[in-house]
């Protein structure tokens, strides 16, 4: 019974809201953070809604050419 409850909670977390997962956040130059974004970052989307946020820097990072 405990395993069934764990599976139910896991499935409900995966299906909740418009979550994108850490791969999508990292691909877009963001970082998944728990709670709040750091100063100089903004909330772009959720890695796992509503707890884990996808935070991106306010200014774009320069790229080397």
UniProtKB/Swiss-Prot annotation:
One BP term from GO: defense response to bacterium
Subcellular location: Secreted; Cytoplasmic granule
Induction field: Induced in the theca layer of the F3 stage ovarian follicle by intravenous injection of LPS. Repressed in the granulosa layer of the F3 stage ovarian follicle by intravenous injection of LPS.
Tissue/organ expression: Expressed in the large intestine, kidney liver, gall bladder, testis, ovary and male and female reproductive tracts. Expressed in the ovarian stroma and the theca and granulosa layers of the ovarian follicle.
Signal peptide (residue range): 1-19
Keywords, alphabetical: Antibiotic, Antimicrobial, Defensin, Disulfide bond, Secreted, Signal
Effect after changing residue 27 to R: In strain: Taihe silkies
Main localization, broad class: secreted
Keyword presence, Disulfide bond: yes
GO CC annotation: extracellular region
Disulfide bonds: 25-54, 32-47, 37-55
Annotated family: Belongs to the beta-defensin family.
Functional description taken from the UniProt entry: Has bactericidal activity.
The protein's name: Gallinacin-12
């Amino acid at each position: 019974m405990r395993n069934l409850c764990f599976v139910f909670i896991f499935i409900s977390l995966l299906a909740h809201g418009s979550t994108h997962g850490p791969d999508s956040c990292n691909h877009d130059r963001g970082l998944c953070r728990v709670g709040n974004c750091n100063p100089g970052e903004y909330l772009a989307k959720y890695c796992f809604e509503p707890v884990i946020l996808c935070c991106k820097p306010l200014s774009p990072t320069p790229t080397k050419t």
